[in-house]
Each structure stands twice: as structure tokens, then as C-alpha cells.
Amino acid sequence: MGKRKLGVIASAFVAGALVCGSTLVNAEPVMTGGPVQGKALWTDYSGMSKEVQGPVSQILFTQSPRTAKGDPYQNYPHYIPEGSRIVLFDLNTKELKVLTNDFATAFDPCTYWDGKKFAFAGVHKKGGGCQIWEMNIDGSGLRQMTDLKGTCRSPIYYAAGSIEEGEGRIIWRDRYFEGDWKEHGMVEKTGMIIFSGSPEGVMDEFHNPYAYNLYRLDTQGGKIIQRITGHVLSGIEFPHLNTTIDQITYNLSSNFDPWLTPDGNILFSSVQANGSRAGGEGRVMICVDNWDGAYPRPIYGNCDGEIGGTSGRSQAKITFGDRKIVYVESPYMNWGVGQLAAVSWDAPFNKTYEKLTGKDGGLYRSPYPLPDDRMLVSYAERGDFGIYWFNFSKCAAGDKVYDDPNWNDHQPAPVYVKYKPRWINTFTAGKNFGVTVVTYQPFDQVKVEGYPHSWGTWICFDTTLSDQPVGPYPHQKAKNVSHGDIKAVRIIQGYQCVEPDSTRFRVGAGAHLLGGERSSSNSGTAFQQRGIIGYQYVESDGSTVTSQLSDVPYYMQILDDKGMSVQTALTWAYLRPYHGRICSGCHYGSYRGRAFKNIHAKALYNWWYDDRSHYDSPFAFRYLKFDNDGNYKGVKHGEDVVVPSDIYYGGPSGTTSQPVEGLTLDKQRTVDFRRDIQPILDAKCAMCHDSNNPPNLGGGLELVSVDGIAAYSRAYNSLLEPQRGKDPNIGGKYVNPSAAINSLLVWRLYEAELSANAPREKIFPIEGRLLHNKFLTQDERYAIVEWIDLGAQWDNIPGPDFYPGYLVK
């Protein structure tokens, strides 16, 4: 049988793309049975065949009431129906059995490998919110799997450590390379569950009342992971349920609809809405990640030129024979119905894109490919969804399986014995724990005691590489750069929007400013609250390496000799504890089909061989250094920093508990307009800039009412004012959020042409005029640069504070 190597790809979310180091190896599938019901065989990567589908005689599916609340497909992915139920339908006898009578609502069924049980999401009649449950296929053996404050949905099974059934021994050594292997008990090899969850009280970047991310669920109280890594899974524990969950993705908007790929990865949809991303509308991309969150990488929908634009992309699954990614393409990002579209799994580019439906005038949802090349779908011609076999030759719904006119029938889950794909090894045991392993065996548990947060490390081979043009948008290059032009990187953490006091928070408070409807009382722009994890220097060849917080959403900016962002990554990235990430440059696009030059980067050499870097890698620095003219002179730590120079792989652990920059949340910086910028304007600018000499920077921190809402000061309203006829995503009259280098305010403060994108004509019109570059100190000027590059927010301090802000009167 032929083998196909999909490539060794190295990458990370940078300038809208995420590419990560991973070797994905697959074999061509060998199918028998054809398009009719029968037996299909799958040849895995090592040439061993297993039966993946016998006769399909039963189908689980969801029935939802035909009301907006009963089937809220226009509120996707926050799909929490009322009164839905899961039923078992026998294709031979045509009998229908309701399995979830004890639930107020139940949906999202997914069958186990042997077809004898299934996982689902549901709200029990006894209460407790929307949780993950498990039940035998006959309706017996109900087991609750989560007890999370929030919403859990879309469970799928993952066969980690459970390719063979039965019990497995937990064997590991105490720490490092010391001692003998010891047995620490037995555990049933039931594998893991991956699901999508939204904690209670969070909002996404559109201020919707949810923000989903993917979690992995240890069905044996953390011991499945213990058998693999040597440490019990650390995360959110439910001892009364004997389960533990660990968040594996970090996105300020939503990651949802997980599905298993043939090579053991997790396929899912990801809403990317960082600030001005995709014209401020955001974009839904199809993404793939390891089951522990180690290597997220984009597949399709991440690029400006990809077909479908800002449409919704959900419920993606991979067909077996021709290996297509089939998904629901919706006219709106928050719709869960639409038309079926597809791209090749092996070459997910525009040339392989195809629209599978659209000529019959109906709506589709819930595609489910089978190994014998058939596919179940849910289809509605006039609002009544039923279950059908899809007719590929006619690009339309074919033979009807079941359609009850009183219910919307959807989410089919055929019952059959499934093949367990090769599972990918994990190097993290959850929050704050990383491990080093030899394939499928626990080897060395690593945790640095005393430090307040675990970290990960990433390296970029060349920060000057980019496929983006020079342009005024933050994700584009502000100017052309070569080796030596990029001096440092700024690492920015996004803060999840959590505002429990509705009297102190107002969505759309800055509708009159650049942020429009995506603004809030925290920000007059589309950029939510965020802080600076730190800075790291860039080598002369454009490479850089750094360590920083793990398990937080972040993105990067590359900085020139003035410390200004030349290009901003507008896709959220994340590191898992003690993992590494390799970045190849600033680009968009799918990681599949990319090939990267193997170069000897200085940062890589210094990381491994320089004595100054033997402690894992340089941690992010708190500040940049400049001369009096504003020229970059290096990075610097704060006065009270502790650098863990005696911590290195295989060495002593827990040497200090002092704050460490890049690791300690208390050591993180942010720039808050009220605290940091308004005092500069009051002291240096307001005496000249008033209503007769705009921008009007007077009035201090007194809130000014606009359209009946008093959320910001007069100075903030003036600086964030839009410019007629100008796209607000490239700024207004004075400020371009996330691109200080393209902002009129900064050009005047530095009295220099800073980029290839002049904010307006005749910026320096009069010779002998008053020069602004002498009024502010370099620290004051750079504080304004940082404020704009972060997104020009009003309130960048999460939680309550004593500075002025919006208040319902």
C-alpha cells in the first residue's frame, strides 16, 4: 500500500496565520463496498487494515421543535435548543425510540468506537446547565461527564491510550532520570472526549454572551493522561464524576464543532475577530490542532482571497474516499445552516473549492460522511429539516431517511464500529504541567515549582518574511523591511471580556468613533482590553526566540528602529505548558502545501549554545531602551526582575519564587488611556489644542456625553474621531489603532515620515512651524506609541478600578 507524507511543517499564528511543527503521516485509504452499504477497510500509516464500517442499521439523530428557541440555528455556535431530544431510528424496522426523556433538551450525539454508547450535550430536567453526558445506545447507563458553570456541547471521542481495549498499567519514574520505573496502579483504557465549552459570564469580541474553546475530558479522573505522561491531568476536576477537563485552545472569540481527522488531529471552526481583522467583521476559518492543543494551524478560510469571504464555516468533516473537507457555508457568521461546500483535505486552496449544493433552493446542515463514501445530511426545502442520504452526482439531497413534519430532524450519527485513528502523543498534562516523553511511554515529569505560571517557548526563523503587501492596514506591512530592520517583537495578551456589572459596561458606547458597533465602554475601537506580555530582541538575520506565559491568547507585532509595529498578527495564538512553537514568518494561508527553507537561525544557535540562554530560553523583557532621539537601543528588564538563569532542561527545579517577567501576571504591563495618556495630554498638549485648534485635548478625565452616553473624555473622543470617506479599519483623523506607525498623531510627535502610508496629504505643510518632537520626553512619546499599537483602548485595566468610566445613572 502506498504511503503519503504530508510534510514536516513548522509554523505559528503570525500575521493571521498559524503554522506549527508537526509531522503528519498518512496512507492512502483502501475502500471496499463502494457507494452502497457494506464493509469498508482503512489502511493506516503502518499498513495494518481494520474494519471501519459494518452494516449501518441504526442512526441516532436530534429532533428539535420547529421554533426559534427550539432550533436556534441563527445563534450558532451558541446552539442551546429548548425541548430537543435524541432518538434512535432503525433503518430496517422504521421504529423510532426516544432516548433522552429525562432531559429538558438533548442534542449533539456522537457514538463511541464500538457503537455501544454515545456522548451528547444536554440539560437534565433536574437542572445543572448544559453538560456533557454519556449513555448506552439502548438508553441505559446514563453518566454525567462535566459539571461546568457555563455551556458544554459537541463532544467527540479521542482514542488516546486506548487503541486496544482493556486495562493499562500506570508506570513512571519519580522525577528526571532518577530511580527505577514503578507501577502506580491500573486504569481502564476508555480514551478521552474532546468538546467545546463556554464558561459562564464571558463575552466574545462581538460582545456575544459566549466564547467557546475546545477542552479535553479525561473519563477516568485524570488517570488516562497519567498513564501517558506520568502525571494526573491538571485542570478543572469533577471528583464526584471521576472526570477532569483541560482547556486546549485559547481564543477570545470561539473555537467550536470539533471533529476527528484521519491522521488523529482535531478539526474545528475558529472565529478570528482580532480588532480590524477582515475589515472588522472577523472571519471563520477551518483549523486543525493536536488533541492537547499543542499545534494549531489554519486549513481554509484564513486568507483575504479565499472563496467564501466572511461567511460562516461550521460542522466540517472529512470524507473518506476523496478526502474532502465538507462543511456548512452560511451567509452569516452566526448561522448553523446554509449550503454545503468543500475543499481538498490534501490541498485546501481555492482551486479545490467547490460548492456542493445551492441549486435546489433548500438549506443544509449536519453533514456526516461514512467510510463507504455515502454521506448523511439534514435538509429542508421549506423550513422542515429531515434526514437524507446526499446524492453527490446531483449535488442535492437524495433518498429520504426520516422526516417528521412536527420536528426538525438533524445531527445524524450513524451507529457502526469505527476505526480508531493513530493518536498523537501529548507533551502536556494540563494546566502548569509539561512532560517529556518517549513515544507512548511516560518518561520525565517537568514542573518548575515556585513560579506562578507555566510557560512555553517559540522561535521565529525570520520575522522579515511576509506574503502581505505594503499597506495601511495593521496586518499589512507598513513598509518594506530587510534583515536588520526588525529590532524586536512585542508580545500582546488578549483579556477575555468579563463584565458582571452591567451598570459599568455598555456595548456600542463608541458607535460614533472608529470601533462602531464593536466598541464598548472599555474601548472606542474594535480592539478589546489587552496587555503586554513583554518584548524580545531580534537577531540580525531576523530570527528571535522567547519564552512566555502559556495557556493565554496572544499575538505578536514586529518592531522597527523606533519600536513601532511594522506588522501585526491578527490571529490569536497560544502555547501549552512547556511546549515549543516554530514560526516561519508573517503570512496568511493554510499550513498544508507549504514548504519552508531549513535555515541556521542565529536565535536558534544562541538558544542552544549561548551560556546566556541556557535556562530554557530568554524570557520576555518588560521594556525597550531608546536614546533621546527615539532610536532603539535594546531590551531591558524591570528593576525587580528575577531571571531564572539556573533553570535548564534536566537541571534543578524550584530555585526561586520571586516574580519573573513574562511569567507573572502582576509583572505584566498595559497602557491605559486614563492612567497613562490623559496626564501627558493635560500637562503637555491641552494648553494649545482646544476647540479652536483640533484635536481638542482639554477637559481632563471628565466624561463627555455623546448621543446620551458619557463613556470617554473629550480628548479620547477627539483622537478616535473617524475621517469622512476613510475606512475606519485604517484609522481616523489622528489614530490608526494597532498601527501607530501609520497614525497622524505619531508622525507629528516624531516629525518624521515613519512608513509608506501617509495618514493624509501635506502632513508637514509649513516650514518654520512649531515642531512637536521636542515637547514630550521619549518615554512620553513611546507611551502614546504603545497605546496606539495595543489598539487605542480607553480602559485597558481588566476588572474594577478607580479611574473614570461609564456608569448608568
UniProtKB/Swiss-Prot annotation:
Cofactor or coenzyme needed: heme c
Catalysis performed (reactions): hydrazine + 3 Fe(III)-[cytochrome c] + H2O = nitric oxide + 3 Fe(II)-[cytochrome c] + NH4(+) + 2 H(+)
Amino-acid positions noted as binding heme 2 in the UniProt annotation, renumbered to this chain: 685, 688-689, 772
EC number: 1.7.2.7
Entry GO MF terms: metal ion binding; oxidoreductase activity
Induction: Is among the most highly expressed proteins in the proteome.
Keywords: Heme, Iron, Metal-binding, Oxidoreductase, Signal, Zinc
Enzyme class: oxidoreductase
Superkingdom assignment: Bacteria
Binding site for Zn(2+): 303, 587
Residues binding heme 1: 583, 586, 591
Transmembrane segments annotated in the record for this chain: none
One annotated Gene Ontology cellular component of this protein: anammoxosome
Involved pathway(s): Nitrogen metabolism
Domain commentary: The alpha subunit consists of three domains: an N-terminal domain which includes a six-bladed beta-propeller, a middle domain binding a pentacoordinated c-type heme and a C-terminal domain which harbors a bis-histidine-coordinated c-type heme.
Protein purpose: Component of the hydrazine synthase complex that catalyzes the condensation of nitric oxide (NO) with ammonium to form hydrazine. The alpha subunit catalyzes the second half-reaction, i.e. the condensation of hydroxylamine formed in the active site of the gamma subunit with ammonia, yielding hydrazine.
Protein name: Hydrazine synthase subunit alpha
